[in-house]
């Protein structure tokens, strides 16, 4: 009889634990302890949108940037404390870039007033993402809940694990693979760039000196290029923002994919999905451009997939009373 190696036993244990953790997430997790949590979150997001049209894109980005670093655990929300917490907020992909933390605080306050000590900060991010999408005209879905908050942050992981707007398709695909997501997830989740804004510094190299060639990115539509060069002139502020989707900037629809087909993807990482020769992403972009329902269905599933990345459940982690610091 073949021996059962310790390494195989460990791998099996990890698989069982991982599967068990994901299985513990449920859309009815708070049905008795905080039955109105979804409505509470939606109300605060709706209020925030009245003053800040771009907040929906900002909130979903927080969820994305949280999940890609050690899993969906709310670690991105932790502030520096001068000793044990070196905040992910100060990692290169996040500093002077991620926003919406005040809205998360407002949601947490409202939820704590209704159900003290029950709902995790990471679950608030997941619920706020769904509210942001549906309030912008996108799909609604039953968010799986039951994650708990990590007590530590991983700034180094944020610097290495998060996809960059300057990366090619090979690197983007690898970073998604690293967290258990596939090419369809990559394209579907990139579709969140159908709303929100981006800073000039995230795409200005495409406008004047792409890959140190001294010329603009040849995949950029020339009319769109001229518009972007006016918004982000050489020597201008890198923190000026413009719409990720120039056609319907605050609506969650499939125009993002139509933009890629006409070389109007704002970020290099956007246009790579369509302009990389022979890439499997091209057919997915074409499908989502032609069929908004297909995009919405894939997006919902990919959001669920992303939300399932290594959650802390059971007795692991904690339910923070303040999203900015461990209890």
UniProtKB/Swiss-Prot annotation:
UniProt binding sites for Ca(2+) 2: 194, 245, 248, 253
Q: What class of enzyme is it?
A: oxidoreductase
Q: Which GO terms describe its molecular function?
A: heme binding; lactoperoxidase activity; metal ion binding; peroxidase activity
GO terms under cellular component:
extracellular region
List locations, semicolon-separated: Secreted
Cysteine pairings via disulfide bonds:
34-115, 67-72, 121-323, 200-232
- Please list which residues make up the signal peptide: 1-23
For the ligand (heme b), the binding residues are 193
Q: Reaction catalysed by this chain?
A: 2 a phenolic donor + H2O2 = 2 a phenolic radical donor + 2 H2O
Q: Which InterPro entries does this UniProt record tie to the protein? A: Haem_peroxidase, Haem_peroxidase_sf, Peroxidase_pln, Peroxidases_AS, Peroxidases_heam-ligand_BS, Secretory_peroxidase
Any single GO BP term = hydrogen peroxide catabolic process
Q: What does this protein do?
A: Removal of H(2)O(2), oxidation of toxic reductants, biosynthesis and degradation of lignin, suberization, auxin catabolism, response to environmental stresses such as wounding, pathogen attack and oxidative stress. These functions might be dependent on each isozyme/isoform in each plant tissue.
- What is the protein's given name? Peroxidase 15
Q: Supply the source organism for this entry.
A: Ipomoea batatas (Sweet potato)
